[in-house]
Amino acid sequence: MNGHAKPPFPKQKQPMPGRTSDMRPQPDHGEDSYRGSGKLAGKKAVITGADSGIGRAVAIAFAREGADVLIAYLSEHDDANETKRLVEDAGRKAVLMSGDIGDPAQCRAVIEKAVSELGGLDILVNNAAHQASFKSLEDISDDEWELTFQVNIHAMFYLTKAAVPHMKNGGAIINTASINADKPNPTLLAYATIKGAEFHRRAPAVAGREGNSRKHGGARADLDAAYSFDHA
């Protein structure tokens, strides 16, 4: 983590959805350490949740490997613009698209904008997530359960469905899963349930497209500062 603070980090709380720009110290997304080698030269990618956290790190890596990127995010405009700057600093095109991917129409609009403004689509990274911490099952409201599935599972389906027809010569669909799929945190029941549902490695591999899920452990991001704000 060149130039970045090392753990343990001070605990911080923010209202949803959280802001990377407000975190102290700032997370490390590979800004100073990642070096590309042209592995994605000329590729076009959509990354959801690319304003911060793992999504921003993926956007930086993809751009430094030669890909143009559509950055899909909810409403964190300052964070998204910083990711855009980092992509453009790597010499690649960056397109911003804000909105709630829990809405199927927004999912279709994201893909349409990528195809229109990037000139095609080769890679879809389903990374955006919603999570909230609750002390017990009884504390999870119906609306919270539905929201978790809309953002984490339904959006993945609608984005993939919209993307596949544009991947004429193959492509890649990558889903960000979680260690919670195997070792669920008891305070993250809804989130752990959907991450278990996501981790079916070959499910998106339809009509010649490569499909993968990638499980991650702890990653310091604005979501961590926000998810327990109202519920802990």
List the model feature ranges, each with a label.
Residues 129-131, 174-212, 221-222:
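Catalytic loop of short-chain dehydrogenase/reductase
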Residues 37-70:
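Canonical Rossmann dinucleotide-binding motif of NAD(H)/NADP(H)-dependent dehydrogenases/reductases
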Residues 149-156, 160, 186, 194, ...:
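Short alpha-helix in the Rossmann-fold core of NAD(P)-dependent oxidoreductases
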